[in-house]
Amino acid sequence: MCGIAGLFGPDGNDAEMAHSMASLLAHRGPDGIQSWSEECPHGGVGLGHSRLSIVDIQGSNQPLHSDSGCVLIINGEIYNHQKIRDDVREYPWRTQGDGEAILAAYTARKSSEDWLNHIDGIWGFALWDPKAGHLILSRDPIGVKPLMRTITSEGTLLFGSESKSLRAHPGHIPQLD
């Protein structure tokens, strides 16, 4: 069980905030907290990850980066990661971990809509594609892995594996829905 957290929008280019958000999820991943951020036309994107090492203990620190510039954080398990490795041989694999299969499948996609249908597993992830200017948030079809989200009054999207990670951001005001 890992924890992911991040922000996207006017004040999203903030690795320290992403780190603070992920730190509130340290109980989900005691093997290290990493963060990353980047400026973008929408303001910025910041991603944080609290890691529990199960597969590829030394080599799969997150965020994961692809050669095309995409960045991924994931909480989950990809059951068919070996099949994806076999199918997407042209992808320059950097780790032995199962999460990188998401980056490979996205990079090798033939359509912007069907690539996720080829993933078998349980997950909550955030994938930043800087060329498209898109942040993709996804949960597995059954919703086993949690992924909470909210938007601040300034228009920044906050997300995390648990709602407690959202509290790190000063613009988060909890409200009943």
Model regions: which residues?
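Cysteine-centered catalytic environments shared across enzyme families
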Residues: 1-177
